[in-house]
Swiss-Prot record:
Signal peptide: none annotated. Its EC number is 2.4.2.7. It catalyses: AMP + diphosphate = 5-phospho-alpha-D-ribose 1-diphosphate + adenine. InterPro entries: Ade_phspho_trans, PRibTrfase_dom, PRTase-like, UPRTase/APRTase. It is an enzyme of class 2 (transferase). Catalyzes a salvage reaction resulting in the formation of AMP, that is energically less costly than de novo synthesis. Its main location: cytoplasm. CDD domains: PRTases_typeI (cd06223). This is Adenine phosphoribosyltransferase. NCBIfam families: apt, PRK02304.1-3, PRK02304.1-5. Belongs to the purine/pyrimidine phosphoribosyltransferase family.
Length: 173
């Protein structure tokens, strides 16, 4: 497939979920199988030299890219879920979002001690979600080495919060 301008496949929704926020809607990209496949393959290219064992990802839109990426790269996948969604014992963390507060959980046995982990998400905004996931991985004895995403919102300065991680993104706003 020829080079695709992925920004053309992401719709901007102003004032969603609240006034002053521009929501980057990836559903048009997902509707086109060739463009979706292209985006997953390009993400894999971005991180092919990274040394990691496992992909972790927050629900729900992160799963969309993380699971095919884990399959393509033959890596473990660990889902990071909202509270009450995982059936076994969990680590839990609460943190601030660009537009509110939320919590995430991960099974206590999801990450092996010393395992190298990357975070995969659809959009990297403030870096708050990745930072929270890194804390969950640390509690389990793993080491978060990087984050990769479809789109990075550079105007929110996520790299300032994630200085100790490799960061890669296909699209920058």
């Amino acid at each position: 497939m020829e080079i695709v301008d992925l920004k053309k496949w992401i719709r901007d929704i102003p004032d969603f979920p609240e006034k002053g926020v521009i929501f980057r809607d990836i559903t048009p990209l997902l509707k086109n199988p060739e463009v979706f496949k292209y985006s997953v393959e390009k993400i894999a290219e971005l991180i092919k030299e990274w040394d990691f064992d496992c992909i972790v990802s927050p629900e729900s839109r992160g799963f969309i890219f993380a699971t095919p990426l884990a399959y393509l790269m033959n890596k473990e996948f660990v889902p990071i879920r909202k509270p009450g969604k995982l059936p076994y014992k969990t680590y839990s963390i609460s943190y601030e979002l660009e537009y509110g507060q939320t919590s995430l959980e991960m099974h206590v046995d999801a990450i092996d001690k010393g395992e190298k982990v990357i975070v995969v998400d659809d959009v990297l905004a403030t870096g708050g979600t990745t930072k929270a996931i890194k804390e969950l991985v640390d509690r389990a004895g793993g080491k978060t080495v990087g984050v990769v995403c479809l789109a990075e919102l550079t105007y929110l300065n996520p790299r300032e919060n994630l200085k100790d991680l490799e960061i890669a993104s296909l699209i920058r706003y």
